[in-house]
Regions:
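Sequence/structural segment immediately N-terminal to covalent heme-attachment motifs in c-type
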Residues: 94-116, 141-146
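Bacterial N-terminal signal peptides that target proteins for export
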Residues: 2-9
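Short Fe-S-cluster ligation motifs
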Residues: 141-157
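Flexible coil segments in periplasmic/lumen-exposed cytochrome c-class electron-transfer proteins
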Residues: 26-48, 55, 64-65, 74-92, ...
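Sec/Tat signal peptide C-region and signal peptidase I cleavage site
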Residues: 18-22
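Bacterial N-terminal signal peptides
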Residues: 9-17
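Gly/Gly-Pro-rich "capping" loops immediately C-terminal to redox-active cysteine motifs
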Residues: 99, 118-146, 162-166
Length: 204
């Protein structure tokens, strides 16, 4: 009897182990560009083609309120969603590695002044709002690389230093733009904390 139980347990563990390994391992995604050759992102919610080996969602949870990203709703809409759970939807998804690197680089260097999640602070503007108001990639790049003084439109008394020689910033400007753009368009909600993704690598 014990032999049969042990055998059954062994077979079950092998089946479960095989099932987990049978799920396709995520493959790298080339950094994305839009029709104007500006950096953009790849983010999918719902049923995607990327799962971790245990079958759980990869790294994003989006909360929708009345079919809008929760960051993009008014206070009145948000209050309705608090009162009626049927108006709330949770979506699970993933992002491309370049955008993930942008999130990581932004929170390593930029959030000290521009606030967590690109929301801004008392002494530096919200980059999310800047993109919503039309900040182009070229301007984004130039300000980061060369800085901005009061004569160039910086807030009084708060100049933007140049990061062109900063090796923690300069190589990642495209990726940071991808992340901030995704935030500005409501694809990544506020407060998301992403895990490390060691299996993702850039395509050569």
């Amino acid at each position: 009897m014990n032999f049969r139980l042990n055998k059954f347990a062994l077979i079950a563990s092998l089946i479960l182990g095989f099932s987990a390994k049978a799920i396709p391992t995520p493959e790298a995604v080339e950094p994305a560009f839009d029709e104007d050759d500006n950096p953009t992102y790849i983010i999918k919610y719902g049923k995607g083609d990327r799962l971790k080996e245990d079958g759980t969602p990869l790294n994003l949870i989006q909360i929708r309120c009345q079919d809008k990203a929760v960051d993009m709703v008014s206070d009145e809409e948000l209050e309705k969603c608090r009162e009626d759970e049927s108006l709330v939807e949770m979506q699970y998804g993933w992002m491309d590695f370049a955008t993930y690197k942008g999130w990581r680089a932004y929170h390593a260097e930029c959030h000290v002044c521009h606030g967590p999640d690109a929301m801004g602070s008392t002494y530096a503007p919200s980059l999310m709002v800047s993109l919503q108001e039309g900040l182009s990639y070229d301007d984004f790049f130039n300000v980061i690389m060369n800085g901005r003084g009061e004569n160039e439109g910086a807030q009084k008394g708060n100049v933007m230093p140049a990061f062109g020689a900063n090796t923690n910033v300069a190589p990642h400007v495209e990726d940071m733009y991808r992340y901030v753009k995704a935030r500005a368009e409501g694809k990544i909600r506020r407060g998301v904390r992403l895990p490390k993704l060691p299996k993702f690598k850039e395509v050569d």
